[in-house]
Structure formats: C-alpha cells, structure tokens
UniProtKB/Swiss-Prot annotation:
HAMAP family (UniProt xref): QueC (MF_01633)
Keywords of this entry: ATP-binding, Ligase, Metal-binding, Nucleotide-binding, Queuosine biosynthesis, Zinc
Organism of this sequence: Serratia proteamaculans (strain 568)
Binding site for Zn(2+): 189, 198, 201, 204
Record-linked NCBIfam families: 7-cyano-7-deazaguanine synthase QueC, PRK11106.1
Name of this chain's protein: 7-cyano-7-deazaguanine synthase
EC number assigned by the record: 6.3.4.20
Superkingdom of this protein's organism: Bacteria
Amino acid sequence: MKRAVVVFSGGQDSTTCLIQALKQYDEVHCVTFDYGQRHRAEIEVAQELSVALGAKAHKLLDVGLLNELAISSLTRDNIPVPAYDSTQSNGLPSTFVPGRNILFLTLAAIYAYQVEAEAVITGVCETDFSGYPDCRDEFVKALNQAIVLGIARDIRFETPLMWLNKAETWALADYYHQLELVQQDTLTCYNGIKGNGCGECAACHLRANGLQQYQINKAEVMASLKQKTGLV
C-alpha cells in the first residue's frame, strides 16, 4: 500500500497537494502544526478539509516552542501584517517564520516513519512566492538527505508545486475538478480571512493574481501545467 503524509495548513497550496495526493496514493495522512499562529482559523479549516476530502487521518501537533523562538507578524499580534510589496531591510517580509519548514518537515518525516509512509508532501514553491529561504528546492533536497540519514529510511520529500506559478497551481486544482472548493473553502490570507481573503496581504495578492491569470487564458495555462508535470 502506498502511503503519504501531507503537510497541511488548509491553504490553497497544501489543499491542492492533498487533492492530488489522494489520487496518487492509497492512504493519505495530514499533519497540521499549531505554533501559536496569529489566526487559529487555519487549523479549523485544515481539520474540516482533511475530513471533507477523505484523508485517512489528520494529526494536529503542538509546536508552540516555535512561537517563543520565531518572531514574525504571523506569530505576534503586535506586528502588523505588511502589504504585499513590503519587505524588511534583509529582504524578507515580516511574515517569514524562521525555521518553520525545517521543523515542520522534520516532524512530518517522523510521523511518516510511524505510519510507514513513503513520502512527505509539502506545497512549498520557488516560482510565485514571498522569498522565504525555506521554500527553496535546494533547501528541501538538503533536508531530505539529512532526514534519510538520520532515520535510516528512504522517506521522500515531494514538492509538486515547486516549479509551478500560481496560475498553474489553480490549473492543477481545476484539473482535479476542485477549483471551486479551493477558491471558497481554503484559507491562505495572512489576516485569517477564508476564501478570497483580505485582498491586501502578500498571500492574497499572489493567490488573486494567479487566479486572474488562469481565468484569462485557461487553455494556455493548463497546457503549461501538463507540460511541466506530465499530466495528460
């Protein structure tokens, strides 16, 4: 039996990954992390979607320690969420949570070990993204190698969205006939607003711009998606 673990936040990207994983694996587990994020709503959305889409199990892990160490506008109410074009002096937006994906992928791999899953799937992307260093392909591959050495099991990190732009990610949801669900029922917004979100933060900007690009030229974007992924 082929099993996979999806790192699941209930947002557009991880939900699209879950939708695809359910088509590609016999058994799919979701793991969501409670790190004291600004909006608890994303945990509730993740729980609802994992059940609605048919995941085998949904594991919620308390990683509150990350909140103590990683100061970010996603973990502190007194730090405002910036507009999409705002950056800090180091080039990173205040929404960057240092070490988040290091911790999440490591814990997801441990969970995968326990449920005998062969893959950990994460929705990180290096094409249309906010510049987070722990979303880069080289980081994921390096951590994957370290994890395999550390647990002596060939657990594979899969990043199906890594080289897709946001329009192609929308096309992927549409390919599986779930575009409406992803648009209406996921929570990507940094201000915690479900669906189309606040329309002002970086996450909402990337999401809305990608959807608009897809809707303007569906055939071309879908063709590009299929060329990149090998879908038929």
